[in-house]
Swiss-Prot record:
This is NADH-ubiquinone oxidoreductase chain 4L. Belongs to the complex I subunit 4L family. GO terms for cellular component: mitochondrial inner membrane; respiratory chain complex I. It comes from the Eukaryota. The keyword Mitochondrion applies. Core subunit of the mitochondrial membrane respiratory chain NADH dehydrogenase (Complex I) which catalyzes electron transfer from NADH through the respiratory chain, using ubiquinone as an electron acceptor. Part of the enzyme membrane arm which is embedded in the lipid bilayer and involved in proton translocation. InterPro entries: NADH_UbQ_OxRdtase_chain4L/K (IPR001133), NUOK/Mnh_C1-like (IPR039428). The gene is MT-ND4L. GO terms for molecular function: NADH dehydrogenase (ubiquinone) activity. Its main location: mitochondrion.
Amino acid sequence: MSMVYINIFLAFIMSLMGLLMYRSHLMSSLLCLEGMMLSLFIMMAVAILNNHLTLASMTPIILLVFAACEAALGLSLLVMVSNTYGTDYVQNLNLLQC
């Protein structure tokens, strides 16, 4: 396993650990999710380029589209929660139920 794969895998693990440890604020959770998506994108792109898989070359782009949709939904939820309650605590999200 090359150093590039190890570094990208460590970036994914660090983002996952950040998501598990710092989950009290919604903004920190969203940043950790974006770090995970970015490391997955880079890992997929490098693996596809190294293995010369031309049929799977659209897979990282599709992952980026899903990451952009996730970021937009997360930021809109962050704005709604912070405008309603004045804080971005994740514990306020269970108050949004009907």
